[in-house]
Amino acid sequence: MSEKKIYGPDVYKRNEHGLLENVDYEFNEDGSVNWRAMIKEEFLYPNKDWFASRKKDVPTSVEGLSDKQLLIMLGGIKELAKMRGYHTIDFKVDNISDGYVTAKCQIDWIENYESSFGGISSRYTDVANATLANTDNFCAKFLETIACNRAFVRCVRNYL
């Protein structure tokens, strides 16, 4: 007998602990979710700069690499945020000067067993920038977007 396929709202149905019912979570020894282990391999790739700085060949696979040898695609961070669950994500962008943009990302996370505050969601904020000095020529046209993406990634990564 095959398992019933989950559709629509059931994909995001949560249990009494705030965890998605259809996800097999990995946990740390202290009982917290091992969010790093929850990132699918399809969202990981070798950190070319790490290998170049050590004059090593960049591997073609992420298998066996340590966290410092890996980078996570934006899609992996987005998936983690959806898995963790949030109420809102808000951005505030400031064009400080020509070629210098800052972004603040604020996420109101849903309550779960890791952050139980009596029915109150937890809020986390982080900031990032994008400048002509820390992006390439192509990206210079998208400083606001890059700053927002960086702030979002920091917000998710540093909260989890």
Report the location of each language-model feature:
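Glycine-rich anion-binding surface patch
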Residues: M1-L160
